Curated annotation (Swiss-Prot):
UniProt cross-references to InterPro entries, sorted A to Z: DUF4646
Provenance organism: Schizosaccharomyces pombe (strain 972 / ATCC 24843)
Key words, A-Z: Cytoplasm, Nucleus
Main location: cytoplasm
Protein known as: Uncharacterized protein C1198.03c
Length: 249
């Protein structure tokens, strides 16, 4: 797909929802292990690439070649899309190359015509992109060679034209924006990728708001308020993990 076929391509605006807000639900690698009943999740690049390619279609001709199979699903215009609380999915580790947990949310996503198979395909796509997160330093020829691994020409073109000098984790952002445009947005949902630096910024904002809410003024009282905040958020306070934030529109 030529990038000229796409109109109004713009870099996604920053997320305005703080991932530490009390109404945000959090999902971690431990939840994935509990759901799958596995102590170890294989998060190797080989596994990510394999599933990313399997979930794409190569049998048809035209603009659908190399794109996820879910993109061919027709949108149900008469469906009533039920809003749900934002879901924050933490990366499996502080190394984003290990990807994100694969957990489906039937009560929230089924009402948006997003099946377990669709969500699995998306997570596999993101995890495949995570495996390629270091390609920001590659040359153009090397990037284009990634098409053989299932990367669509759309993502590559978007990466080269829009992200190469303007964003961290360009391949991951390219994949997610493609899914938002082609699949999630028409179904009244949206996914943000929030890297660890952005998580740290949001945590600082959340801590400051907590301190202000407690009416702290001196250094000691601010320090105690910060300790209280960290204790309340001890399971999700790490800034080393990137996040996926799933919201309803």
């Amino acid at each position: 797909m030529d990038i000229k076929d796409e109109k109004a391509l713009t870099i996604e605006k920053a997320c305005t929802i703080n991932v530490f807000a009390p109404f945000v639900r959090n999902v971690t690698a431990e939840d994935e292990k509990a759901v799958t009943n596995k102590k170890h999740i294989n998060s190797s690049a080989t596994v990510h690439v394999f599933h990313g390619v399997v979930n794409r279609t190569f049998k048809t001709k035209g603009n659908t070649v190399g794109l996820p199979k879910s993109f061919s699903k027709a949108v149900i215009e008469t469906l009533s899309y039920k809003p749900f609380a934002p879901i924050c999915i933490h990366s499996r580790s502080d190394e984003v190359v290990n990807g994100f947990p694969l957990i489906y949310f039937p009560e929230d996503l089924a009402s948006h015509d997003i099946s377990g198979k669709d969500w699995k395909s998306f997570i596999h796509d993101v995890n495949m992109a995570c495996s390629f997160s270091d390609v920001a330093l590659m040359g153009l020829d090397q990037i284009l060679n990634l098409v053989s691994f299932g990367l669509s020409a759309y993502v590559i073109s978007y990466y080269v034209e829009k992200y190469v000098d303007k964003a961290k984790f360009p391949i991951i952002k390219g994949f997610i924006e493609m899914w938002n445009r082609k699949f999630f947005n028409p179904r009244k949902t949206h996914v943000y990728f929030i890297n660890s630096d952005e998580v740290a910024e949001q945590r600082a904002v959340s801590i400051k708001a907590y301190q202000q809410g407690k009416g702290t003024k001196g250094l000691f009282s601010k320090f105690n308020a910060q300790r209280e905040w960290k204790k309340q958020h001890q399971d999700i306070s790490s800034t080393q993990h990137s996040r996926l934030l799933l919201i309803s529109l």
